[in-house]
Amino acid sequence: MTWEKELSELKSRRKLVEKMGGEDNIKKHNERGKLTARERISRFVDKNSFEEIMPLVGESIYENDTQTSFTPKSSIDGFALVNDRRVALSAGDFTVKGGMGKGASSASAGLGQEKSITQEALINLIPYIRLLDSAGGSVRNFEKIGRTYLPDGNSFV
């Protein structure tokens, strides 16, 4: 038995994930003077140190056992080095559904058994960094209070 078909599909999905929300959405994002989530990560972390977790999570549509479309999750999560210190980080990908998730996040993938990036940071006792890009709320408010809001859910870092 050979795994060529399955390996080919994984490679294809990886290429689709790296295209984020597609060329048009990336172009619109850049025209607004904004960096994409992957560009922000690349500029923030030590060179070539980012290790994305669960990069193939997303929403696939199949017709007759053939994948016709794939939308990646709207959050890019992983581990990296910042000034040679290991950190966990998350960046909202605004090119995918305006940064809004639809249940296809690293925390909800795989029957809910995986730990979220915030839980991984807590377990490993490393800093957790969020690279925010928001459509709502006031960033000025975050500046004024000197922090962001506390995350919802069962994980608390």
Regions found by a protein language model. Give the residues of each.
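Terminal-region recognition feature
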Residues: 1-157
